Amino acid sequence: MYRKSIMQESRDIQLAMELIALGARLPILENETCLSRSRLLRLYKEVKGTPAPKGLLPFSADWFLSWEQNIHSSAFYNAYLCLIRVGNIPTIEAMIKAYRLYLELCPQRQDGGPLLGLTRAWILLRFIDSQLLGQTRCKLCGGAFITYAFHPPHNFVCSFCHPPSRAVKKRKLSHAAADNRIYNLRQRNMCNVKPC
């Protein structure tokens, strides 16, 4: 008879609680922990105060390629890659840290939530692992952005260098607020983050 380690179960519960607090859906919890579905349902209700949402996870790779979603998912993935390269940490921990960094640095929507939810961030990593999506460097700025895995690298221009016309209408930050945010990011990067 197989006996589960109490320490491993404790780590799984802690991980599940952290993922639930960040907005993870039940299939992610089942995939990343060894806890039973019934325990995860109870834990979800304890942490969130509501039952776990039902339904399928979003599964379209096209979502990550539209202009605003592409910028947000690329920012998250670049932070994730930096953490993987610099630190010797498990991928799930790198994902959580990169997502927390994304939440801290990227502006929230008017409804208060992030554009890139944790569920989509997790799915993005799965799409990249399965080589459905990948990264391509912009030929103008040199930044790495999410594209289809085998996108021709010599023609790609990112949404920053060539924004769609609707991008101007969606701007939520005033110039002063945007400049202040950029200044704060530069100060934080100079003080705390080693270059990747």
Swiss-Prot record:
Co-factor binding comment: Binds 1 zinc ion per subunit.
Top-level division of the source organism's lineage: Bacteria
GO cellular component terms given for this protein: cytoplasm
Transmembrane domains' residue ranges: none
Keywords carried by this UniProt record: Activator, Bacterial flagellum biogenesis, Cytoplasm, DNA-binding, Metal-binding, Transcription, Transcription regulation, Zinc
BP-aspect Gene Ontology terms: bacterial-type flagellum organization; positive regulation of DNA-templated transcription; regulation of bacterial-type flagellum assembly
Subunit and partners: Heterohexamer composed of two FlhC and four FlhD subunits. Each FlhC binds a FlhD dimer, forming a heterotrimer, and a hexamer assembles by dimerization of two heterotrimers.
Similarity comment: family membership: Belongs to the FlhC family.
Record protein name field: Flagellar transcriptional regulator FlhC
Organism: Sodalis glossinidius (strain morsitans)
